[in-house]
């Protein structure tokens, strides 16, 4: 199983990188994640071209010094550095209207040192001389791809060549086990936990390399059950674990989360809960994945410190009250085995099945115990419910005026379904559909207005009788 290739768009500000990003992803909304506050202004999007999928990074821009001079370190922003090292392929975007300036030359020099494929794009060629892009030959990066990204011109030529060596999308075979993604910040103990889980309990383990992103899919067996462990940090051999050099990659984490059945989020007890931990949990929540939280490095903490962390958990994890939290020591193996029952419970909850009759009965019981509020002088009516999907489970409720149902009542219904089905470790989505009258807005076929209390069919017969009588002499 392989990860998608990663393409980074780099260049000075305002050369059109974001426009190319939107052209590649075919929408201005196709962000995998908005990483504000975590990785500054990088944006990640999914793209597919000629049945080949890849991830695009819009790096936001490499700054320009006031005097137009300076080393590449003066120009390069931190997020661009990270994106360049995450990427498999680099697209260097320059402004054909502005021509080549010092910053372009400095970036070009740096790109020569990376040993990665580089595609040079001369954007904004509309209205400039045909020979204008030629000056960028001096960068030594080959012939520029002329482009007017704002109108989509030239993008196909770039994508033809850029995706030429990418593998076509294929339906991957099931690995034959429950897929677990281990996620977390650097140095929280992900690799130690991975090796502990594989440790003495390993029966048959072999590494299945991903791409240059270093994510590895490792099948293993425990107590007769099969698993596939997705290690976003890369598995180190026993005795060679050095988490000080473990690198965090948003790309690897996001793709592992999407590919997993259950996410195990690792948090460092010694450092406490930080915003980046909440970002990672948010990614899993947005992806609808079942989840278990492991508070690592619990051994050795004072009782006062442990109590502080428990209070902090109650305060900051209130958006995922259904997630099971375990206090472990990956290094010593303390309570690591307790993760497995919670993993299986979370997965079973995410895949539960139930009949429409049973769901509707639970809905009726919930409504009888706590009726919906009035809206516009009328009681909101909820008719029936059915299951709309799995992982995460989706319950669809049909009724009238469902758009007026308060958020508090929606949460009430979600909690009722959770309680009845004992759903633990998985998000639950409750969607509401409006029952529509197929005859609403249509004119009646009768030539006369309906008399009060008279059905349309009876009125029609009366009208016909009246018409026949009117022709008699």
Swiss-Prot record:
Biased composition (Basic residues): 459-473
The organism's place on the tree of life at top rank: Bacteria
Sequence ranges assigned to domain EngA-type G in this UniProt record: 5-170, 178-351
SUPFAM superfamilies named among the record's database cross-references: P-loop containing nucleoside triphosphate hydrolases
Domain KH-like: 352-436
Positions of the UniProt region annotated as Disordered: 438-473
HAMAP family cross-referenced by the UniProt entry: GTPase_Der
Binding residues annotated for GTP 2, in chain numbering: 184-191, 231-235, 296-299
One Gene Ontology biological process: ribosome biogenesis
PROSITE patterns reported in the protein's UniProt record: G_ENGA
Known partners and oligomeric status: Associates with the 50S ribosomal subunit.
Binding site for GTP 1: 11-18, 58-62, 123-126
Pfam families according to UniProt: KH_dom-like, MMR_HSR1
InterPro entries xrefs: G_ENGA, GTP-bd, GTPase_Der, KH_dom-like, KH_dom-like_a/b, P-loop_NTPase, Small_GTP-bd
Functional summary from the UniProt entry: GTPase that plays an essential role in the late steps of ribosome biogenesis.
The entry's keywords: GTP-binding, Nucleotide-binding, Repeat, Ribosome biogenesis
Name of the protein in its database record: GTPase Der
Organism: Psychrobacter sp. (strain PRwf-1)
Family: Belongs to the TRAFAC class TrmE-Era-EngA-EngB-Septin-like GTPase superfamily. EngA (Der) GTPase family.
GO molecular function terms listed in the Swiss-Prot or TrEMBL record: GTP binding; ribosome binding
């Amino acid at each position: 199983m392989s990860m998608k290739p990663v393409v980074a768009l780099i260049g000075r500000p305002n050369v059109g990188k974001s426009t190319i990003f939107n052209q590649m992803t075919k929408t201005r909304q196709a962000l995998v994640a908005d990483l504000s506050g975590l990785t500054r202004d990088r944006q990640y999007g999914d793209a597919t071209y000629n049945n080949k999928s890849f991830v695009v990074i819009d790096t936001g821009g490499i700054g320009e010094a006031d005097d137009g001079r300076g080393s590449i370190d003066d120009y390069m922003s931190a997020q661009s550095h990270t994106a360049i090292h995450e990427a498999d392929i680099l697209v260097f975007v320059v402004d054909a209207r502005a021509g080549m300036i010092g910053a372009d030359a400095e970036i070009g020099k740096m790109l020569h040192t990376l040993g990665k494929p580089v595609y040079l794009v001369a954007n904004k060629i509309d209205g400039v001389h045909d020979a204008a892009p030629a000056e960028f030959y001096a960068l030594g990066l080959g012939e520029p791809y002329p482009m007017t990204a704002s109108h989509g011109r030239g993008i196909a030529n770039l994508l033809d060549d850029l995706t030429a060596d990418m593998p076509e999308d294929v339906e991957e075979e099931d690995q034959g086990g429950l897929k677990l993604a281990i996620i977390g910040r650097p140095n929280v103990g992900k690799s130690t936990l991975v090796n502990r889980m594989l440790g003495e309990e390993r029966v048959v383990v072999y590494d299945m390399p991903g791409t240059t992103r270093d994510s590895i899919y490792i099948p293993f067996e425990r107590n007769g059950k099969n698993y596939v462990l997705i290690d976003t940090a890369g598995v180190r051999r026993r005795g060679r674990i050095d988490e000080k050099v473990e690198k965090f990659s948003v790309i690897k984490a996001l793709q592992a989360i999407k590919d997993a059945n259950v996410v195990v989020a690792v948090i460092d007890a010694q450092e406490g809960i930080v915003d980046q931990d909440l970002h990672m949990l948010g990614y899993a929540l947005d992806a609808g994945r079942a989840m278990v939280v492991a508070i690592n490095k619990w051994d050795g903490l004072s009782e006062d410190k442990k109590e502080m962390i428990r209070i902090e958990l109650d305060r900051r994890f209130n958006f995922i009250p259904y997630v099971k939290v375990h206090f472990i020591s990956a290094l010593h193996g303390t309570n690591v085995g307790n993760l497995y029952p919670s993993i299986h419970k979370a997965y079973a909850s995410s895949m539960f099945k139930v009949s429409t009759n049973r769901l509707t009965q639970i809905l009726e019981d919930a409504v009888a115990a706590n009726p919906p509020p009035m809206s516009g002088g009328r009681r909101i009516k909820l008719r029936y419910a059915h299951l709309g999907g799995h992982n995460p489970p989706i319950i669809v409720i049909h009724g009238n005026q469902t758009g007026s149902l308060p958020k508090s009542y929606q949460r009430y219904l979600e909690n009722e379904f959770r309680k009845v089905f004992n759903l633990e470790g998985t998000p639950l989505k409750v969607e509401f559909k409006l029952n529509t009258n197929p005859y609403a807005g249509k004119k009646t076929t009768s030539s006369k207005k309906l008399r009060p209390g008279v059905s349309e069919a009876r009125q029609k017969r009366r009208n016909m009788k009246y018409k026949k009588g009117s022709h008699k002499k």
